[in-house]
Amino acid sequence: MPHAPIFILGSHKSGTSLLRSLLDGHPDLFVIPFETHFMALLGRWITYSYRKQAPVDDANFLEGLVEILESYAQSVDRQADVVLGDRLDMDAVRAFVGEMDEADDPIQALTVLKQLLPQVVEGLDSAQGKRAVEKSVEHLEVALELAQTFPKAQFIHIVRNPYANMVALRKFKAKDQAYPLINKVYKSLESGYYW
């Protein structure tokens, strides 16, 4: 990968999506317009309260990526982090993925994303010669592995006032149901402050 990636880290509702949107205007950056969760798709153990996953030995990155993109394509929630429904060509995604070799490590996964997304997301510029910017909240837990895999990577860790963060997260999670239990909110914020 010719250019070291930039990883945006932080807990839910801390401002990571805003920063991703601001960086998207930079001509030298290829900003992935959604949370890829690529380390989880590679089978990594994730303990972040809202994205828990046990380690998976036989993870299929490409299959998981198609599932995530399908969920984004079907989303009509205008308050969601990303709405790609009318910009994403799922037939092109399936055709592209059908011709790709499986990604087994973070470098391969990020390379697949840089090759795939400009071809299937309408209006997304080419990633050729640009630094990738990736934001997935649970990647805070695997930041050391990312730093070892991408030694020249840069990390932007956003820390928001915990009280404001807690209120925003509880309001966000309450839009579909009652307010979430404070314990789960607290645990997700706690993991966002200890990197």
Language-model regions: role of each:
Residues 2-5:
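Pre-Walker A (Motif I) flank of P-loop NTPase domains
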Residues 17-30:
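A conserved segment at the C-terminal end of the G1
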Residues 32-34, 158:
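Generic beta-sheet signal
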